[in-house]
Amino acid sequence: MEKATQPRAFYGSFFHAPAYGSFEYLERALIEVGEDGAIERVIAHDDPDQAAALAKAREAGTLYELGEGRFGLPGFVDIHIHSPQWPQAALALDEPLYRWLDERTFPLESKFADVDFAKKVYSDLVDQLLARGSTTAMYLGRAHLEATVALAEICAERGQRALVGKTVMDDPAANPDYYRDASPAQAVRDTETLIREVEAIGRKSRAGAWPVITPRFIPSCTDEVLRGLGNLAESTGAYVQTHCNEGQWEHDVVLERFGKTDPYALRDFGLLREHSIMAHCPYLTEEEGEMFAELGVAVAHCPTANSYFSSAVAPVQRFRSQGIHVGLGTDISGGYSPSMYENIRQAVLVSRLLETGVNAQLPPEERGGLGEGTRLSLVESFWLATAGGAEALGLPLATFEPGRAFDLQVIDVKRPDSDLTGFGVFDEPIDRLARILYLSTPDNVRQVFSQGVLVCDKDAR
């Protein structure tokens, strides 16, 4: 698709959330995009320059018009995905975590030693994510180097911006013999190789690709490998991702092993730093949160997966008030859906439960709710899925502002089987946005652009 002539001016009505807690509706705006896929200018409909700019783009054949009944949203930024778990999405989520891992996840992930199998799965996963508007994705590949490099190549070929890590899990006492790193030294060497190869892919990728240092989580790793990965993070400045304070079991294991909690252990191994993305974190204390903010550590909030396997809700509003960067993750396949729309909805839902508590057999004051100021609004959740994820990654994207990468999903609200028009009732911009975020199906997402290039076109099918 990149070889075809690409639009350089996009005319229509757009929603975005450039600031936490608010959104902007850019009605009949013209967005001009440079050859590099970055936004150059946003011209409002009442700007006297718009008519001339529209005419110029139309004459040059570079104008794209969204059309009636269509709206533009920024591409989503999904900052926590287990790429090899895609074949088990939606499976065994009613089982305990240990059974889900031992009987499903580890046997499945071990199959990715077969690179042909890995490419088949990863190609479908990336296509499915793009079809749902996710133009940026942060992946945990698995313990196989070649398959993980192949994932980065597939993302680059399809136009998805990707941050890719080879998961490290080397402790013989904690991981199955058939699926673990051969040694701490080999795990670090493989991660060094991954960094070189993904950086090379990124230099050729229009949207970009970045390597990520990825210990699975502390219980699966030896001290030696955690120390080695921390040193590698220091020397390379690469992104870091892992699970942190995900559940009570993890918390207890780390505390018994080190005499300190998960965040402090990760810090002492050199794995908490700017561009570290910590997934889940519902058990993060206020003191630990202050440390995150001071170090520039970000949280990947995974509301669906937390409900299944953390038995807790992350206090996102507290994180934000402490100055912690927070984005949103689907957490395939601890989260069943590849859709960020679903996780936007779930983030709002679980925050309401955190606000009030859930045991109706107890008096309200004893239900464990955190009270007023805990709930997320839909607009705040939309921000988490777009600008919040971009902020967590430190990348200029996910809003319609000059200098930002132009990532666009075109939403058709008049699809025959998914009509979001609302019959002309409650038709303010916030109502239109709410219908899009709550009711959209993949069929409503008609076209997706990444870095200014068309990467998904359902209208052409």
What are these regions (language model features)?
Residues 1-61:
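N-terminal metal-binding scaffold of metallo-dependent hydrolase/deaminase domains
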Residues 13, 36-37, 69, 448, ...:
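Glycine-centered positions in the ABC transporter ATPase nucleotide-binding domain
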Residues 19, 405-460:
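C-terminal cap of metal-dependent C-N hydrolases
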Residues 70, 89-160, 190-205:
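Alpha-helical scaffold segments that flank or form the walls of functional sites
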Residues 87-120, 171-185, 248-273, 298, ...:
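Active-site gating loops and adjacent loop-to-helix segments of metal-dependent hydrolytic enzymes
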Residues 146, 151-282, 287:
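Metal-coordinating catalytic core of metallo-dependent amide/deamination hydrolases
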Residues 268-275, 317-420:
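His/Asp/Glu-enriched, well-ordered alpha-helical/loop segment
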